């Protein structure tokens, strides 16, 4: 077992921060700061597992002795900010990988980047960090949040839907989701409801949908909200109305949704059956190690580790300016295939319409139906003045 793998095994098992690090030019320290407890834990666990899988395959990232410290942000901005600060200032983290949620990204970006570290998000992609608040030391291996919703709006537009019912929880991400959908959908809106955060009973909303009989429904209902909505949608006999979604039916929720989600649609930058050699190898290795189908969070964590390795090798070490310059060139082969960074350090990549299928082995997964956007850059990049 390599030194890297020994350190991963020791450090990934705990959320406690390590003792102060000695500055060593030949040692890389990576902090992995993700939501690993509470309702959002399944997403953080997937991102962590994908990252650690790639790190184990790589061995020594960039040919350097590698120390990986895994920390739980508890999905609390104040906790996350303190732990990010400790990772950089106390533990000497050169790079912090995280977070899952956008409000956590807002809390940790300053402690990491002003403390001298580089922040690489394997999921969160808030509009401000893609636009006016972009930073040289912030990168995302995921997407800008609006893009998944734009995929579904474009699909609805292409299908000629004229009467779509919109559903999302009443908080900023929910409001942004429906706004993103409308950026690429110009048809009529049958109804628009913002539900309570954490709501689990959708009988009233489903009754309205049944009465209105819209051309389709678009929903953004992440986590347990999505599990319940999908089950109740099927139980209400509404499966004849196309169900379009983002962050509602994916590999994180499908084990609980199962047959109820079959045939439902989602927007994504990836699916387990994306046809690249790197993706086939990743999915096989992930399932062999963890026993379940990887989700987009796992893929983005996996790509983050491979990006770091490639940039370190190109930069020749952890010098911050050289490493940022190397990261900008995206010197790795993504499991997604084509991948580059825009001027705001967010990916330029393809986006797909996916649907839920049951594989021959009985497991549920998303599957690509068609490509919606090719080499798509987010709408906020033009507002980024990197400084």
Label every PLM stretch briefly.
Residues 230-302, 313-316, 356, 366-387:
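Extracellular/periplasmic periplasmic-binding protein-like sensory domains
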Residues 28-50, 58, 71-78, 100-103, ...:
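Extracytoplasmic "Venus flytrap"
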Residues 19-23:
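Sec/Tat signal peptide C-region and signal peptidase I cleavage site
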Residues 73, 120, 124-130, 197-198, ...:
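Venus flytrap/periplasmic-binding-protein-like
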Residues 288-298, 309-367, 379:
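Segments of small-molecule ligand-sensing domains
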Residues 82, 127-130, 135-236, 270-281:
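Extracellular/periplasmic Venus flytrap/periplasmic-binding protein
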């Amino acid at each position: 077992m390599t030194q890297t793998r020994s350190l991963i095994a020791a450090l990934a098992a705990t959320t406690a921060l390590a003792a102060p690090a000695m500055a060593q030019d030949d040692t890389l320290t990576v902090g992995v700061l993700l939501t690993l407890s509470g309702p959002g834990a399944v997403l953080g666990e997937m991102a962590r597992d994908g990252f650690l899988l790639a790190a184990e395959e790589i061995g020594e990232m960039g040919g350097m002795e590698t120390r990986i410290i895994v920390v739980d942000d508890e999905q609390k901005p104040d906790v996350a900010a303190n732990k990010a600060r400790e990772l950089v200032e106390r533990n000497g983290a050169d790079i912090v990988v995280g977070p899952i949620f956008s409000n956590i990204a807002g809390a940790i970006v300053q402690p990491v980047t002003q403390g001298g570290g580089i922040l690489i998000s394997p999921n969160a992609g808030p509009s401000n960090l893609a636009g006016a608040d972009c930073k040289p030391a912030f990168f995302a291996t995921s997407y800008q949040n609006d893009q998944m919703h734009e995929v579904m709006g474009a699909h609805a537009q292409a299908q000629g839907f004229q009467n779509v019912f919109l559903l999302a929880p009443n908080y900023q991400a929910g409001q942004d989701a429906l706004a993103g959908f409308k950026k690429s959908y110009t048809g009529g809106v049958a109804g628009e409801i913002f539900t309570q955060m954490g709501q689990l009973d959708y009988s009233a909303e489903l009754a309205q949908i049944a009465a209105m009989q819209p051309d389709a429904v678009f929903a953004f209902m992440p986590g347990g909200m999505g599990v319940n909505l999908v089950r109740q949608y099927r139980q209400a006999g509404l499966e004849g109305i196309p169900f379009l979604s983002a962050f509602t039916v994916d590999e994180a929720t499908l084990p609980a949704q199962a047959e109820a989600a079959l045939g439902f649609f989602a927007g994504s930058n990836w699916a387990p059956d994306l046809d690249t050699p790197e993706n086939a190898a990743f999915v096989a290795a992930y399932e062999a190690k963890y026993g379940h189908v990887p989700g987009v969070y796992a893929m983005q964590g996996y790509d983050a580790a491979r990006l770091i390795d490639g940039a370190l090798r190109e930069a020749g070490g952890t010098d911050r300016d050289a490493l940022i310059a190397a990261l900008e060139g995206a010197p790795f082969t993504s499991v997604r295939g084509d991948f580059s960074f825009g001027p705001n350090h967010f990916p330029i990549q393809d986006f797909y319409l996916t649907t839920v299928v049951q594989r021959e082995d009985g497991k549920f997964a998303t599957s690509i139906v068609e490509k919606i956007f090719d080499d798509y850059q987010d709408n906020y990049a033009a507002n980024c003045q990197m400084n």
